[in-house]
Amino acid sequence: MIITTSLRENEELIARAQALALDLGADYQPRRKLSLAKCLERFGPFYLLYKDRLSFINSDASELTFHPDTAALRIKAPYDALVSLLGKSPKTILDTTMGLASDSLVMAAAGNQVTALESQDVIFQVVSRGLATYQTDDKQLEKAMRSIEAIKSDSLSFLKAQADNAFDILYADPMFSETIKKSENLEAIKPLANGSRLTEEWLNEAKRVAREKIIIKAHFRDTVFEELGFERQVRPNQKLHYGVLELIDRKS
């Protein structure tokens, strides 16, 4: 894997890129004012370091970057469907599918302690570093970003290593079985993401590790809710539904 810098490079940015290359096990290549198309031609998919963020350029030239704009809008809204399902905060929450971290951020901003898992290395590197370094004047959002513990792991392996009732709530937002709408970051994450569906083995481990409930999100046409026994939370005029599996009564 290659890492290079934005065109607005200086000695400090080059030094950071070289250090990051060592950290990522990647090779640093000077930008030499090459266009992104020329970089792709020479390097294949590559990391791109800007002054304020790390991005990844896919083979189709789509750019994966961290930006909490969607989460910021949801945090400022008077109501959020996911937050309403969590119950009274603070809760300990395991987000088993971090992705772009929008849901993790919304849950953390609501006062919960969030641990977020990401199995795919490129997504983990871009998003976890964004959570740790992204600067904003929105102090609530910045506090939420810094509070999230991001861990590179597939969810099943992580769950198997946890004690019973280790988290209050488990959350999963697997890749959509249906396309919702075009979004640059969603398009960029698609070729990098883990497209695995949730399985009975995953659910059994999740039931053991979660103390209160498991929440999933999927397209309204997805049959995962019925397949795994989740109570579908219908959201009128919304293409994404949540599913909830309450556990407290089963464990009492």
Model-inferred region functions:
Residues 1-93, 109, 117-169, 235:
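S-adenosyl-L-methionine
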Residues 33, 99, 218-221:
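Short, polar loop motifs at secondary-structure junctions
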Residues 92, 112-113, 147, 212-213:
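Residues at the starts of beta-strands that form the adenosine-phosphate
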Residues 96:
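Conserved beta-strand/loop positions that form the S-adenosyl-L-methionine
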Residues 100-112:
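Conserved SAM-binding loop of SAM-dependent methyltransferases across substrates and taxa
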Residues 174-202:
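Mobile active-site "lid"/loop adjacent to the S-adenosyl-L-methionine
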Residues 199-246:
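Conserved Class I SAM-dependent methyltransferase catalytic core
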